[in-house]
Regions:
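Basic- and aromatic-lined ligand-binding clefts that recognize polyanionic substrates
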Residues: 1
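Histidine-acidic metal/acid-base catalytic patches
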Residues: 5-17, 23-176
Length: 176
């Protein structure tokens, strides 16, 4: 990773981080703030790091949420290119794509709902007890209600799987 990051810096090109290609204890989310200090823009290939076969479809997991929080906390929504992985040999590709994109959108929404200004203030005050308390409280914040409202306002059905199955039966089955 260090070679590729150094090379992109040397050549003045946008670095790409693929969170599916790091050691299991190494997190891309930990690298974002440092990369943003030295790069005008960065690119992320968000995937699910499964270290066998396929099944890389992005889900609303801890690392995806942490990546989104780093982007939002660094006020870098306009500086980070986000791509998702939807390769999976065992499930419908359309469903995998929609699920992955929605998971990233949910993670960004979750990050945008965090009380970042309050957390920064507490950090500056060395009030780590309240930081921990607030972070724990936010884990159960009603993101589902906000997500449902977002889908409704965008006129997007919450249940995309019905449409995917219909497409699968009417279109995809004819391709076999």
């Amino acid at each position: 990773a260090e070679f590729c990051l150094s090379y992109s810096g040397y050549k003045g090109i946008t670095p790409l981080m693929d969170n599916g290609h790091y050691h299991p204890t190494e997190m891309v989310s930990d690298k974002i703030s440092s990369l943003l200090l030295f790069n005008e823009k960065i690119a992320l290939h968000i995937t699910r790091a499964v270290r066998w076969d396929s099944d890389h479809v992005v889900i609303f997991d801890d690392e995806t949420k942490e990546i989104a929080k780093e982007i939002v906390r660094n006020d870098a929504l306009d500086r980070v290119f986000i791509a998702t992985d939807y390769f999976d040999a065992s499930i419908n590709r359309i469903s995998a794509w929609v699920s992955g994109v929605r998971s990233v959108q949910k993670a960004l929404l979750f990050a945008l709902l965090q009380p970042d200004e309050r957390l920064k203030q507490l950090q500056n005050e060395n009030n780590f007890t309240e930081i921990m308390y607030l972070q724990e409280e936010m884990k159960t914040a009603p993101i589902g209600d906000v997500w449902s409202e977002y889908l409704e306002r965008e006129n997007v059905p919450a249940d995309y799987l019905t449409e995917v199955k219909k497409y699968e039966q009417e279109v995809l089955v004819k391709r076999i």
